């Protein structure tokens, strides 16, 4: 149980730091509208899945953002190493958060009802 609490705390810290790095360090216009919505860590803190949402619904924008995030993974890891006090920075994997789109569809259905 204690390990879960620690991984949750580290995940929240990683989410906050990556959002800050996106706003202040990454100059790539492809990630301008990206927002980090969640981070899921493995129990041993070696892997982190970083979920992001995008303001644009265009498939081309989504692909560009995914490419830019993958390209900036090294920058994220090096900045996290400077900012965080954990022994090993987890390997980062970026995944689009589909729950935002799902919520929008539910809202749309409810407004039609």
Curated annotation (Swiss-Prot):
Native species: Lactococcus lactis subsp. cremoris (Streptococcus cremoris)
Gene that produces this protein: rbfA
Subunit comment: Monomer. Binds 30S ribosomal subunits, but not 50S ribosomal subunits or 70S ribosomes.
UniProt entry keywords in alphabetical sequence: Cytoplasm, Ribosome biogenesis
Matching PANTHER family: RIBOSOME-BINDING FACTOR A, CHLOROPLASTIC-RELATED
Function: One of several proteins that assist in the late maturation steps of the functional core of the 30S ribosomal subunit. Associates with free 30S ribosomal subunits (but not with 30S subunits that are part of 70S ribosomes or polysomes). Required for efficient processing of 16S rRNA. May interact with the 5'-terminal helix region of 16S rRNA.
GO terms under cellular component: cytosol
Protein name, per record: Ribosome-binding factor A
Keyword Secreted: no
